[in-house]
Amino acid sequence: MAIERTLSILKPDTVKNNIIGNINSYIEKSGLRIIAQKMMLLTKKQAELFYAIHKDRPFFGGLVEFMTSGPVIVQVLVGENAISKYRQIMGATDPKQADKGTIRGDFADDVNENRVHGSDSLENAHKEIAFFFAECELV
């Protein structure tokens, strides 16, 4: 099994509703470790660059607006098969389709405000981590 790193973002709805500890508990119980974490307020430019893959999608403007509406927590998680493991504990993108016992199944109600982001591939994990963290910040 491969030890991987993945990016996690606890979105503004998570920070606003003060459930950061709840989400971190799900992460830690899954066997993943948080090796870097910081709170930040994304600028419009940062959000547009980070989500550039979606720039031609109808939800792009709303996504950028939401992701800049309040602080986020960006994290780097590490562990065996971290990317697929974190995606599994996040649950389906649409909380209505997410299983109970997943972050979105237990804490989210809306596909547009679904609490968390996680990298979807090893290649994207490398890019996304480098977007927010210098290598020296990863302990």
From Swiss-Prot:
Its EC number is 2.7.4.6. It is found in: Cytoplasm. Pfam families: NDK. The keyword Cell division does not apply. Coiled coil: none annotated. GO terms for cellular component: cytoplasm. It comes from the Bacteria. It is an enzyme of class 2 (transferase). The keyword Transmembrane helix does not apply. Keywords: ATP-binding, Cytoplasm, Kinase, Magnesium, Metal-binding, Nucleotide metabolism, Nucleotide-binding, Phosphoprotein, Transferase. Its cofactor is Mg(2+). One of its GO terms (biological process) is CTP biosynthetic process. PROSITE patterns: NDPK, NDPK_LIKE. Major role in the synthesis of nucleoside triphosphates other than ATP. The ATP gamma phosphate is transferred to the NDP beta phosphate via a ping-pong mechanism, using a phosphorylated active-site intermediate. Homotetramer. This is Nucleoside diphosphate kinase. It comes from Wolbachia sp. subsp. Brugia malayi (strain TRS). The lineage of its organism: Bacteria, Pseudomonadati, Pseudomonadota, Alphaproteobacteria, Rickettsiales.
